[in-house]
């Protein structure tokens, strides 16, 4: 199985093709298996937009990012917001692997996710990223984040594949506690004394510190790792897939080396949380990162397990 096969089988703009691409960019030696799911027919897509206003009084380049991918529009003096929006929309649609489609209407670029469900809400939008990028004079922009995606597939039948089969590391995109509870039950059952099949599920979640630690407290699982996705310019699914790629590669090449401080390559960092926030998250069962320049480095990778079966805190 390879990156090119994932594009061929699932479509180059699919969730699986993007996640598999992240995996194989990091790890080309450890086998990857994937499970394809249809969208929930009752689900809804995510939408967002960037609204431009004004007329350019200076030349330059407008740089707009979707999930870390940059799209540009060359701007000349006198260009209107509507003209720039048309250029930007064309640039986005030219990339047939992008996970949104774009339509320009009078200075606004409307974006619609390819997939239904909550996944599209995680696609991050940003104007300018690098220090040498700036919006041309005379033009202003307002971004509406991707939102409105709902109705994920039901994993009840899919979970049966985990029963009595060993998958050491699992990344998946659906982070509601009901879905994660199903996965935890399956992985816990696999680890019973008669089987001892280990396996861990990794997910990335964007949220506040309070909401993240509330989630991990409710999960309290020895088999689920929740990543703080606020630090990474990516969806949680791609982020989680990159992490399992790095961990499995590191485990094979340096089994006793551990994972503290290793670099997650191929992802753009966003502003990191301060140390006290990261400590609070780690203490609550959330895996965190430190950003060093353009590098994302693991602080620690933890599961959400915090209390034993008697609800006593585990030191």
Give the ranges of each region predicted by the language model.
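Short, surface-exposed secondary-structure junctions/capping segments
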Residues: 18-19, 85-96, 138-145
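Extended, beta-strand-rich, solvent-exposed assembly scaffolds of outer structural proteins
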Residues: 2-11, 54-126, 189
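Extended assembly-interface regions of large multimeric machines
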Residues: 1-58, 93, 100-105
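Long, acidic/polar, low-complexity amphipathic helices and coiled-coil-like
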Residues: 100-103, 120, 125-204
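Structured loops at beta-to-helix junctions and adjacent beta-edge loops in soluble globular domains
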Residues: 37, 112-114, 173
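Intrinsically disordered, low-complexity boundary segments flanking structured domains
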Residues: 17-23, 111-112, 156-159
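A glycine- and small-residue-enriched flexible loop/hinge signal that marks low-structured segments
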Residues: 24, 68, 90, 161-315
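Acidic, glycine-rich low-complexity/disordered segments
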Residues: 42-49, 53-54, 139-155, 289-315
